[in-house]
Amino acid sequence: MTITIEQPHLDAIADRKVAGGGGGDNAAELVLDGGFVVPDSNAFGNAFRNYEAESERKETVEEFYRVNHINQTYDFVRRMREEYGRVDKTEMGIWECIELLNEFIDDSDPDLDMPQIEHLLQTAEAIRKDFPDEDWLHLTGLIHDLGKVLLHPSFGELPQWSVVGDTFPVGCAFDECNVHFKYFKENPDYLNPKLNTKFGAYSEGCGLDNVLMSWGHDDYMYLVAKENKTTLPSAGLFIIRYHSFYPLHKHGAYMHLMNDEDKENLKWLRVFNKYDLYSKSNERIDVEKVKPYYMSLIEKYFPAKLRW
């Protein structure tokens, strides 16, 4: 099955615009007329991504980042990419993978403690409402977190610190905008002169495709999609690999590593992030009602069975 997909152009979407540029909390925020309304607080009554707010999840989340920042090294990421990039663990369809995630809750997320299928459908449906003609973006919303299947026993039952959480480049200096930055000081790469400078193992404008990111569900699903020859546009693959890269799309860090294609795709990632982050709620989606639509998109952009 071969489908030719043109790269989407954000500027061509009527009644939508990306305002601002560079970093910052409001950088490139999507402006929608009568579209998705950003809620004031998360399911726990706190501001979204508030890692200091007292809540029942605060200690769990901080301990997660402590272990994550200590162990996500350049060598560790290379080993994990080599192991899981072979996509030889099993074969299954996209929807089968979605159902596997039902039993998992993300320990790095301060905003939600519901099974992952709820978040996937909330994200996809919110995007679908505001971007009805961008079916590739609906599907990207549905599958962006499927790499969390690494938590399942069939995939080695990896610890959460190596599957979820904000991502960041390894092989160069850790930026101070990273959540709980202080714990990087215990990472072996922190004092390695070959890996702790601004560019480290990379060069200016080398392109994020050439940068190793901390290992987790983002990079894994990106590898799975590429190895199974998805026909999603490059913006979809960019969203999958970098949707947890908050230092970039929230704070504007690490932009010196990006090339021109990355900068164009970043516009779509910032659009996507609004739905990924703010659609999290305790409202339930009728799975059986929306399943036929998403099954049609899966058939359009992926083979029936994927190698994982």
Curated annotation (Swiss-Prot):
Signal peptide span: none
GO MF entries: inositol oxygenase activity; iron ion binding
Name of the top EC class for this enzyme: oxidoreductase
Cofactor note: Binds 2 iron ions per subunit.
Cystine pairings recorded for this chain: none
Family as reported in the entry's similarity comment: Belongs to the myo-inositol oxygenase family.
Protein's recorded name: Probable inositol oxygenase
